[in-house]
């Protein structure tokens, strides 16, 4: 029989065990920190009714969605966690307690053209806070503060969370008499870092129909730079000319104040008027996070405030604020840039227990003792030469090997070898547990990411 050649579809990430362990460490950090801020996990179906997922209309979403028929059912794979959240909240609005704080970490699917760093199946991590009728602006500062904490624990140092408010942009465009074109202008401005100011100017004038003067005025406005305090002070000069602008400026000032109170250093967040977010459902504060030494990567995390989350499924006003991290792409880019910590413990076990007798009873009892102490333990039960057993431990990167032979069993001891240092000692089981636990604690101190 002819054998099929195994292959993985283009645009789907499949990791070997060691990098998978690093990816799992990132997931652990996310879950731990999201829980620390009082978020509850939810898991929505990967497959939904196409009608539900496409409630906001077609466009680019419909082009990218994985859609199929099963009998009479028109189905689709979720393409993000936001639309399923809207359905979830509308469906369970009478059972949920508001403000509802949830996180979702899972795979989403988009039929994008496969290319370097772009995936058709990828992990996305979302956090959102949903209010009932109202939602305090304080939440709009707490969300990016969580991102700061998560990225810092990943090991990233040189990153910046850019913050803006769409009410400021809408208000400014209204001052220029461009309210009807504000959506098109924002989507164009959102491409600034990809295509540059000259091409943005061309699109504003030739495609959207702005005058050269208005296009230049917009580019001058979004180019305002300085410290956060300096940018806010320059924006004060526009106050009093548009109500939406004034509201947005008040909100942005409050968000920057609370970001500092949440412990986010000024070098890690900046008021940036170029941030617009292309999606129309954002109504207030918007964010994008970038790595300062790798601007070519683009945004590694983005989100913002929205006031009509479930408008297609419910008449209830459910404002919210949230952010999403494209984990698969972030991990791919970090790996490609050589920024994943090569010394991070990626072994599937802390201890490999090598029984040196035919009877495994003592080995099983010791393994149980080690596991009860929280140490991940494998028993090597294959009848192979000693060298092969040690090679197995070495290839997997297991840091400790415990030998248990007739002499050790008779004396109530075991031999513990640290494969990283080569040191070997004879200890009681309790002493072995303590030694290994301390060693593993030290090995686990490293971060997932090492910035160069």
Kindly label every feature range from the protein language model.
Residues 63-72, 178-200, 291-293:
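Acidic, His- and aromatic-enriched active-site or binding-groove loops in soluble protein domains
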Residues 161-171:
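Glycine-rich, mobile lid/loop segments that gate access to catalytic sites or pores
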